[in-house]
Regions:
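Alpha-helical, largely C-terminal catalytic domains
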Residues: 1-220
Length: 220
């Protein structure tokens, strides 16, 4: 849902078309390393995560809605501040939180209202992730990003269970904040996540958000 006429990959492609200038040793400058070039291309591609607004909020008429990156950042903070849990790698949770929606830099924020199946959504995102990792270059970092994304997508570890819960907690917390700030009623976000939390932490944090919502409603 980026506003630019060129896709993020188009932009990176244009950048990659230029040839590295010949820099003489007399100038005192050295040409940028290929790894630095790939890193900056990848980060440029990720820029749209900061500018693409989350579809669910747009569809509900929220003014100035959060971006995809906003959402992932607070999930990262959730993973940072959560207490130690048995057999859960908190550092892995932080990494997973900041990459779980990274493919949306290309495909955008696909919401249920778009009428796209979960299988097709996953296929598009995986293809986008492969393209992004090609930009970054094959190596340990690309493999780590793909592994983290797949683990989250498959919900195949305790870390993925927790981060998926944080995805929902962050959403309902944001919904509560928008209800307070903009006078909205955003029941659908709370209804769609009810009884879907997998971890004790997720259930406890969601219960706290819901309790605050109930209290806020009663005090009006």
């Amino acid at each position: 849902m980026a506003d630019d006429s060129l896709s993020p990959l188009d932009d990176v492609g244009i950048q990659n078309q230029r040839k590295d200038p010949d820099v003489s040793t007399d100038s005192g400058l050295t040409p940028p390393s290929s790894s630095a070039s790939r890193a900056i291309d990848f980060l440029t591609l990720c820029r749209s995560l900061k500018t693409t607004k989350r579809t669910g909020w747009i569809n509900n008429g929220i003014k100035g809605p959060e971006s995809i990156a906003d959402h992932m950042y607070r999930m990262g903070l959730m993973s940072l501040i959560v207490g130690d849990l048995p057999a859960v790698d908190r550092e892995r949770c932080i990494k997973m939180a900041i990459v779980h929606d990274i493919a949306e830099a290309i495909v955008g924020d696909i919401a249920p209202s778009d009428g796209i199946s979960k299988e097709e959504k996953s296929r598009r995102e995986e293809a986008a992730l492969e393209e992004m990792c090609k930009v970054l270059g094959e190596g340990t970092r690309s493999e780590e990003i793909k592994e983290l994304w797949r683990e989250y997508e498959d919900n195949s570890s305790k870390e993925a269970n927790l981060v998926k819960d944080f995805d929902k907690v962050e959403m309902i917390l944001q919904a509560l904040e928008y209800e307070k700030e903009q006078g909205k009623v955003l029941d659908s976000f709370f209804q769609s996540t009810a009884s879907k939390f997998q971890t004790d932490v997720g259930k406890a944090w969601a219960a706290e958000v819901n309790a605050r919502r109930t209290s806020s409603t009663q005090n009006k």
